[in-house]
Amino acid sequence: MPSAKPLFCLATLAGAALAAPAPSRATDFNKRSTCTFTDAATASESKTSCSDIVLKDITVPAGETLNLKDLNDGTTVTFEGTTTWEYEEWDGPLLRISGKDITVTQSSDAVLNGNGAKWWDGEGTNGGKTKPKFFYAHDLDDSKISGLYIKNTPVQAISVESDNLVIEDVTIDNSDGDSEGGHNTDGFDISESTYITITGATVKNQGDCVAINSGENIYFSGGTCSGGHGLSIGSVGGRDDNTVKNVTFIDSTVSDSENGVRIKTVYDATGTVEDITYSNIQLSGISDYGIVIEQDYENGDPTGTPSNGVTISDVTLEDITGSVDSDAVEIYILCGDGSCTDWTMSGIDITGGETSSDCENVPSGASCSQ
């Protein structure tokens, strides 16, 4: 600590000369400094002592959160090396970051490794081991997450509950879960959020690439999704917030997945899905549905019986092209009586599968055939 005394003395002398402003400048100096942390406890305890936080080769103890909640405004968080989490059955999250005007990024070779294989048992959140969610980006407002490489999350990767958050060039690689029992490894789960922009994401998983449960003004562009359940809205209904409004999925690919484009709402619930656009979505290797919109979910599964309490309106499906498996359905629409309105479909060219004869209450402007 040889440098502490000179700094203290300088601050004291400045205080003698300039009175009250000196402590303010000392505080500003501390906030401008860079802190490098190599253990989770110190990072969590000292996170507000500086405005540039470097997390280097941290191993987070079992059952603990790498907690970067309530950071100072304007803080930058940089991951270096490999960040890992030790095994314990619990709900998580493994990582939590919140604050305003925060930048979260990493060095070029960094990895956030959730060690998901230790939890994977083919059950996901439906049973078996209790699995922690990975990253809560909650109350991370007016902020940016850029360039993260996330590998092997136990279940859902990034949970978003924020306002004005940009997520760019993030990779979520749960491809090991294809053969090791990964399930419900959603890429991005979005709820109670406004103005969320996700660009250039790569998601390899066994769950939704994106699932929007509630929120407004959400934009997903340039995504590459494989192995999972597709680009999803819902299930909508039965939550505190049951509105999804002004959502765009554009210029993205979905491959080797159960679904391409999906909107699902909860049976006998209420809510609103409004002003939705899927544009220029390319599909390949889809096993279940190219496009599926249904209003019959109950206890997490479709029932075949729709209800009309959640309305789905102002939907644009355009330039959705590609192929599905031979036993997959190209387009399936199951709406309640009068609850689906003002839809337009154009440039739909999905090949290789079956045409559904079970669609119900298909709104004007849409069709289950091409």
Swiss-Prot record:
Function: Involved in maceration and soft-rotting of plant tissue. Hydrolyzes the 1,4-alpha glycosidic bonds of de-esterified pectate in the smooth region of the plant cell wall.
pH dependence: Optimum pH is 2.0.
Propeptide: 20-32
Species this protein is from: Aspergillus awamori
Family matches, as InterPro entries: Glyco_hydro_28, Glycosyl_hydrlase_28, PbH1, Pectin_lyas_fold, Pectin_lyase_fold/virulence
Keyword Isomerase belongs to the record: no
Compartments where found: Secreted
Homology family: Belongs to the glycosyl hydrolase 28 family.
The protein's name: Endopolygalacturonase A
Reactions catalysed according to its record: (1,4-alpha-D-galacturonosyl)n+m + H2O = (1,4-alpha-D-galacturonosyl)n + (1,4-alpha-D-galacturonosyl)m
Positions annotated with a glycan in the UniProt record: 246
Uppermost EC category: hydrolase
Coiled-coil ranges per UniProt: none
GO CC term (a single one): extracellular region
Gene Ontology molecular-function annotations: polygalacturonase activity
Name of the gene this protein is made from: pgaA
Temperature dependence: Optimum temperature is 50 degrees Celsius.
GO biological process, one term: cell wall organization
PANTHER family per record: ENDOPOLYGALACTURONASE B, POLYGALACTURONASE
Alphabetical UniProt keywords: Cell wall biogenesis/degradation, Disulfide bond, Glycoprotein, Glycosidase, Hydrolase, Repeat, Secreted, Signal, Zymogen
Enzyme Commission (EC) number: 3.2.1.15
